[in-house]
Amino acid sequence: MGRKKKSRASTTEEDEIEMDNAGPSSETSLYEVLGVERRATSQEIRKAYHKLALKLHPDKNQDDKEAKDKFQQLQKVISILGDEEKRAVYDQTGSIDDADIPGDAFENLRDFFRDMYKKVNEADIEEFEANYRGSESEKKDLLELFNKFKGKMNRLFCSMLCSDPKLDSHRFKDMLDEAIAAGEVKSSKAYEKWANKISETKPPTSPLRKRKKKKSAAKDSETDLCLMIAKRQEERKGKVDSMFSSLISRYGGDAEAEPTEEEFEAAQRRIESKRKPSKKSRGK
């Protein structure tokens, strides 16, 4: 009898442990909303985001309040998964610290976007991109994201629709400098540092030309910050988790605090410097 009771108690404990391990549905629902795997690269995440966003963009759904709300929620999703530090924190804790996206909203968003995703094809994306780049709508989104990320352009490019740092950096700089001079947005040290670097590089001859399709994630990882982030997370996840855990503990006391742009870039350099020697040692 005692054994049966113990077995039953053990079963109950196992059930509780299993439920705890399952965690809240929100733990993986950010990825489910976009219809990507948890280990998806940043390129895959951005592609899924762009595909959904072009259908929900306010300019294409001016009379649809529901579409506008979902577009805003979609932007919050990409603001987490498209940001190196926020994604690392989310992967570790499952927490998003955003009261504007309640847990039960993820299931609704996931189902809605899953249906929406099927309705979008490559032709839709190309048509949207051709009309969007260089438009007033693009400028409006640029200024909104500039304010949101406080001039941190690396993060802005991760969320900006149809953007390419190689093609758009000079163009965006001109637009932002004009907006800053007109008092539409406020400059920041992070932006000024980025703008100085861009000023020293040669602008593209045709920035609004049709963007080339990217053929290889390996090649993109050398030029696209978002892909570099994803690649490092996959290859050195343990080290990334450890590094960002220390950042989280440092800034965790203040919900508004976050690493500076210098710390953000220094963290990236540390990971790269640790990864390169390991490749050499393998070759020996």
From Swiss-Prot:
Identify its protein family. Answer: Belongs to the DnaJ family. C/III subfamily.
The UniProt entry lists the main location of this chain as nucleus
- According to its UniProt record, where is this protein located? Nucleus
CDD domains assigned: DnaJ (cd06257)
Keyword line? Chaperone, Nucleus
Query: Pfam families, alphabetically?
Result: DnaJ, HTH_DNAJC9
Stated name of the protein? Chaperone protein dnaJ 6
GO CC annotations on file: nucleus
Q: Which Gene3D superfamilies has this protein been placed in?
A: DnaJ domain
Nuclear localization signal (motif): residue ranges = 3-6, 209-215
InterPro entries, sorted: AtJ6-like, DnaJ_domain, HTH_DNAJC9, J_dom_sf
Task: Provide the tissue specificity.
Answer: Highly expressed in leaves, flowers and siliques, and to lower extent in roots.
| Family matches, as SMART domains | DnaJ
Every J domain range: 29-94
The job of this chain, per UniProt, is described as: Plays a continuous role in plant development probably in the structural organization of compartments.
User: Which parts of the sequence are annotated with region: Disordered?
Assistant: 1-30, 196-221, 252-284
Composition-biased stretches, type Acidic residues, lie in: 255-265
Which segments show compositional bias classed as Basic and acidic residues?
266-275
